[in-house]
Amino acid sequence: MPTAETRDTGLTVRRTRWSRAALAGIFVVGTLGLIIWHANHPDALPTDDRVVSASTPVDEPVYVGVARGVEGRTLHLSGVKVHATSNTDVSVTPLLCRGGQVEATTDPAAFCTDLVNPEGEPFGVDDSIVLQLTSDQPAVAVIDPVRLGFRESFQWGTLPTGAGAVVRVLAR
């Protein structure tokens, strides 16, 4: 009866410790890359095509609501970035309106249970971002949608949200 003969053809692949370590390293780096990418890419915030219009006399602040909380999400704000263009100096201060929403008013207390600096605050569905605008001379200010710096769960980012605004500061 014939017997099987084993022959060495020299084409065998030998795995070394180095190749296993390299594969494990590639896997770890790839996994960390995906985690870091996911942490820096939260879901987009809603933007609005509408433009909020308001007017106020010189030296009297007006409060303009530009962004509302998002259903099902609570953001922990690190800041609010505002870009405004005007024909003269205007002061624009972002504020967090707790428990209410404002379109445009000179008395936000009627609509907000509390008006606070948004930095470090949670931003929920019942809250809104309000811009306080004032000028000591007549002006027209065009304000782009705000950008919120925030953390949500283990994701963080700075994204645009809300509506733009046009505010006219009128002479007395």
Which residue ranges define each predicted feature?
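Non-catalytic macromolecular-recognition regions in eukaryotic signaling proteins
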Residues: P2-R172
